[in-house]
């Protein structure tokens, strides 16, 4: 069973993990200020944010964790009824403050489609490596 990268518990991927790098809680004056220069509704800004804060920041994930997380995202994207906007609201027990205005994002599904496209592009070798393994042995 695949274990969490930092804890001795089973790893259960959650789409909110993709939002973790954008958590501005207690960092409003630094990270929050940096995010204020981007418009989350513009494709070019979204792509820059995803590359810098998810792709480049994903180094704490092993190739196996990346595969499981991307598979989970693919599953959600294949469900036409999945409400991606709910991921941007404060969930009980999930303490993440997203940048101002993100809860009003025009196309939350599009944001996650961009994440899927870019992670599959930039993590291609890791995802391929993991797909060649027997996941039941993890």
Where are these regions (language model features)?
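Alpha-helix boundary/N-cap detector
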Residues: 6, 10, 41-45, 64, ...
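Amphipathic alpha-helical binding modules
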Residues: 85-138
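Amphipathic alpha-helical interaction modules
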Residues: 28-81, 85
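Surface-exposed, interaction-prone regions used to assemble/regulate multi-protein complexes
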Residues: 12, 25, 29-32, 61, ...
